[in-house]
Curated annotation (Swiss-Prot):
One of its GO terms (cellular component) is cytoplasm. Its EC number is 4.99.1.9, 1.3.98.5. GO terms for molecular function: ferrochelatase activity; heme binding; metal ion binding; oxidoreductase activity. This is Coproporphyrin-dependent heme b biosynthesis bifunctional protein. The active site is at 583 (for coproheme decarboxylase activity). It comes from Cutibacterium acnes (strain DSM 16379 / KPA171202) (Propionibacterium acnes).
């Protein structure tokens, strides 16, 4: 690290001159595995037992997956902050791996850094996820003899909308990886790190609803709510825990994920999606405990199993985290407040290891000065009973950024034992309303987050007249060879059609994707007569005389039967994307005679599969009596391969049995009229 020239008062991050991402750390080579385990276990576990645990790393080549994940995370935060004009460095310091926390702090101090903002890789407030990090920063400062550096900490970020969105989208993507299953036979199990009951009792900010369990339940409810909002439904969900450690006699949060998975078949569950909302990245606990052990338990229980991704470096999550960092800096300058309900610095007494634990020095807290701790911290180590490994449930079996590797004294409380441990954590929405009566791979309207898009009011769209025409042509005679002449021909024809009052959503180059068609023009209007006028004008234009019609159809938006808030993307404020695929379809006669509940169930499954691909935008319009089809559908996306993926995935749903016709397809790239003409045959 070179001398820091960025500690300028004009930097958006002033008064901070560095951001320090603090993570758990892990071995970066096979040679580091045993030293890492000795460090994590504090010498309390025999060497032969550590050797057994070390074998967990063999399947990863002796390298913890946390390292790559954290490195990418640090880079993502740095890049996002630079977009906001931040020039101060974003660095990494690990508690148990290189680069070590003390080394990072010492290096920063040597280069003149005196005020640091720390971001820990834990979204939730508890001793192991918050206070322990603050204590270890203070201890590292004391060990290094640094007494003139202030380290503040970003508050827990589980409330961040981007964190919720990242987990919701990961969950919807995961639905695509399980076989088609009735909603009532599908279960979502949200998973987080288990902690001792005594740590749960002392977690949070001391206010009702801020404890560890309540934080997770709130996130589960918000993630489930977003999934339900996207396509109108959400399977029943539970909250379970992984990575329990310590003495078997000490109570920890339950149910354990393995035990819970084994209980699901007797509840009629056939498919399960495990969503690790308690973790920010794919580290050892996620990959080993869920991808291997939980997956094996599910297989043994006859369950179809998949695991959703962690939030990782999802763009919305990183953007919100950068916003929290900038907000903290503004608050430190006296220019604003925090963007979350969590106090910064932490309130006195929050997130102790257990309710009566004696505080030791910690940075960024109301009960201890937010400066380097005194020299007496050097020998301070949390006390407690000797660590007793419990089979494969040892804390060092699953090291990760939120691992609880320190033993916990017995809780002074008597935790309530429940006959149904999931009763406090299960969604009440076991009966889910179905989505709309069409083939749209997206559901209820949500305000757009892409800057290209604009919000609309669904009720106004449903109350208005919204029409579209899709007209396909082939080049019958060569276009002019001279560039200016060809450009005038095309631009004049487009302008002449536009004088009808129509809006042109796009020109699409079909060449090569079909042998008999070269152009599709997508027009939209509030009046079908305007669409007809535009078509007549285009056919009579100079360009029109070079073209022959291949296919043309009209559709109109009608409020959906099962989900009135579903809107076609073309009328929902969604900007056109680079690629589009257009096709008609006709349902079978049997479809319309099915009970509404059956159609709703099948469309609900269809919606779960399709809505997981939120990057592909769908516009389904009714075409009854307007031509030979019942529906006209357009799929738009920035990546043509993603449109292919969506169409393939939708072949596996039950509603597909009730489709008689779903061709022809017209697929092409959206281009300007001039670009399209430049690509065509010339005289």
């Amino acid at each position: 690290m070179t001398a820091n020239p960025y500690a300028a008062p004009t930097d958006p991050l002033a008064p901070y001159s560095a951001v320090l991402v603090v993570s758990f750390g892990g071995p970066r080579s096979p040679e580091e595995v045993m030293p890492f385990l000795r460090r994590v276990s504090h010498g309390r576990i025999p060497e032969e037992r550590l050797a057994d645990v070390a074998r967990h790393y063999d399947r990863f080549g002796g390298v913890s997956p946390i390292n790559d994940a954290t490195d990418v995370f640090v880079n993502a935060i740095g890049n996002e902050l630079r977009r906001h004009g931040v020039r101060v460095p974003v660095l990494l310091g690990n508690r148990n791996g290189t680069p070590f926390l003390e080394e990072a702090l010492t290096d920063m101090h040597a280069h003149g850094v005196r005020r640091v903002l720390a971001v820990v890789t834990s979204a939730y407030a508890s001793y192991s996820g918050c206070r322990q990090y603050r204590e270890e920063i203070a201890t590292a400062l004391a060990h290094a003899g640094i007494t003139d550096m202030q380290v503040d900490k970003v508050p827990p970020f589980n409330e961040a909308p981007g964190f919720i969105r990242a987990n919701a989208e990961a969950l919807m993507q995961a639905f695509m990886r399980i076989p088609p299953t009735p909603l009532e036979a599908t279960r979502v199990v949200f998973v987080t790190h288990s902690i001792p009951d005594s740590m749960q009792d002392a977690s949070g900010a001391g206010q009702p609803g801020t404890d560890y369990i309540s934080q997770h339940k709130a996130v589960c409810e918000r993630v489930a709510g977003q999934v339900r909002q996207v396509f109108g439904n959400m399977p029943q969900w539970d909250l379970a825990y992984c990575s329990r450690s310590g003495r078997p006699s000490d109570p920890w949060l339950e149910p354990d994920i393995i035990d819970h998975l084994r209980s699901l078949p007797e509840q009629g569950v056939q498919s399960v999606v495990v969503a690790p909302i308690g973790f920010v990245a794919d580290h050892m606990e996620v990959v080993n405990d869920l991808d291997y052990e939980a997956a094996e338990a599910a297989k043994e229980s006859g369950l179809a199993f998949t695991r959703a991704a962690t939030a990782g470096t999802h763009s919305a999550f990183i953007a919100d985290l950068a916003g929290l960092i900038l907000s903290q800096a503004a608050a430190a300058r006296g220019e604003g407040g925090n963007l979350t309900s969590w106090p910064a610095p932490c309130v006195a007494g929050c997130c102790r290891r257990y309710p009566d634990a004696q505080d030791i020095p910690a940075v960024s807290g109301g009960d201890v000065e937010s400066v380097a701790a005194g020299a007496d911290v050097v020998d301070a180590e949390p006390g407690g009973v000797d660590f007793v490994p419990s089979g494969s449930a040892s804390a060092v079996d699953r090291p990760g950024p939120e691992a609880v590797e320190l033993e916990t004294p017995p809780s002074p409380y008597n935790p309530l034992t429940k006959e149904t441990p999931m009763s406090d954590h299960s969604s009440a929405d076991s009966v889910i309303e179905g989505p709309r009566d069409d083939e749209v791979p997206a559901g209820s309207y949500t305000a757009p987050t892409d800057p290209r898009d604009t919000p609309v009011i669904p009720e106004e769209v449903n109350a208005s007249s919204k029409w579209a025409m899709y007209s396909v042509f082939r080049v019958a005679t060569a276009l002019p060879a001279e560039d200016d002449e060809r450009r005038r021909l095309v631009e004049g024809s487009d302008e002449w059609a536009g004088q009808s009052g129509v809006d042109t959503r796009g020109w699409y180059d079909l060449s090569g994707l079909r042998a008999n068609a070269d152009l599709l023009v997508w027009w939209v209007s509030d009046d079908p007569a305007v669409l007809q006028d535009a078509y007549h004008r285009f056919r009579a234009s100079g360009l029109g005389r070079h073209l022959e019609p291949v296919w043309s159809n009209v559709g109109v938006h009608r409020p959906a039967e099962f989900n009135k808030s579903h809107l076609p993307s073309c009328f929902a404020g969604i900007a056109p994307r680079r690629w589009a695929a257009f096709y008609p379809f006709i349902r079978s006669k049997e479809w319309y005679l099915l009970p509404a509940a059956d159609r709703s169930r099948m469309l609900r499954e269809h919606g779960i599969v399709g809505a997981a691909s939120s990057d592909v935008k769908a516009s389904t319009l009714a075409a009854f009596a307007l031509g030979d089809y019942e529906w006209i559908l357009a799929l738009e996306g920035d990546d043509l391969a993603r449109i292919v993926d969506v169409m393939k995935d939708l072949r596996y749903v039950e509603a597909r049995r009730y489709v008689d016709v779903d061709t022809p397809f017209f697929t092409g790239e959206r281009v300007s009229p001039v670009v399209w003409a430049d690509r065509q045959m010339r005289a």
